[in-house]
Amino acid sequence: MHRIYFEKRCILICSPDDQILSDPNMIRFSLGGSQDIHSLVDMVEVSDSLHRVCIPTSDIQGTYKAICAEFLEVNAGGGLVSNRRGDYLLISRNGMWDLPKGHQDPGEDIQVTALREVQEETGISELEVRELICITDHCYKRNGIWHLKHTWWYDMLYTDPTDLTPQTEEDITKAAWVARSSLPPYLLNTYPSIQEVFHEAKI
């Protein structure tokens, strides 16, 4: 299955026999060509009540690639950072709790991107990059052009007691360590793509 997020909404690409299709609130959509992709994106963009749309297909990867081809694709890297106490690093950006991430520079290894962006957005160093958690996809429109951002999320361990310094020029107003037991209310005020990262990390 592939998930493509539009802020708090989601397009899912799944097999025709996927259990998720039994959800009575799931809207099904059949793709016939690139025009259908644009119609679907327009529909998701303008509808406040449309939360999840599923595209059942026997060719999940081919359908995913066809959708990606209709966007300007960009890559990003980010981190789910924990410290030795087991707390997790969250940032507040534009009124939502988020994880530090940012765009890949030309020629840059994506793991290096993730490490650099965490350091820039939170002011911390002494990070140990462990394993790739998952890759999430989300769409946004900039200057009238639809972008599809693929974000590589890495598990990171912070080993130094340096204070957090939010990168205010990136609209980050706060960075905080949150105990695992205190995460639920924070995750209620974040994006589904960030919730997916925590889910894939089994947190």
Where are these regions (language model features)?
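Conserved beta-strand and immediately adjacent loop positions that scaffold enzyme active sites
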Residues: G78, D87, K174
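Acidic, metal-coordinating catalytic segment for phosphate/diphosphate chemistry
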Residues: S34-G78
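Unchanged
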Residues: Q104-P192
